[in-house]
C-alpha cells in the first residue's frame, strides 16, 4: 500500500490484540504510538495511533477531572432514583446502582477523578454516571462533548441518543490537534 498524502492518521483501542496491532503496523509501515486522552482531558481513553506525522510524546499532562467539565444546573431528568450501593468516595468508581444491567453501566464515577472511556450509547441506563451531592445522574450530552474536548453544543440539533453515540464514536479533539501540530 502506498500513500501519497502529506500525512495519515489511524487509530484503534489500546486493548486490541497483538496480532491485529502487528497487521496494521505491517500494512501502514509504521509502529503505533500510545496516547491516552486522559493526558488532554477528563476522560481516560487509551488508544494506539499510527501516523507518519512526527508526534511529540513529551508533553504536559492535563490535571482536568470530571468535576471540571460538569454543568452546574442540570435538569432533574438526568438524575436516577435507583438505590446506590458500595459508596466509597475515595475511589474513581465510587458507587454502583442497584438495577438490572451490565456491571459497566451500574458504575457511578467520583467527580474528582477522570471518567472511563466514553462508549457509544443510545440511551437507557448506558451513559456514564456521576455522583453529585449524594445522588447519581447520567452525564449530559454537553458533558460528553467536553470530555471529547469538543466545543459546547457541537452536536446540538440531533436527539440526545445520537449526541451520546457521536461522542462515543469520536476522537478526542485535543489529542488529534496535538498529533497534527507538526503539520502546521
Where are these regions (language model features)?
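Walker B catalytic acidic pair
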Residues: 11-12
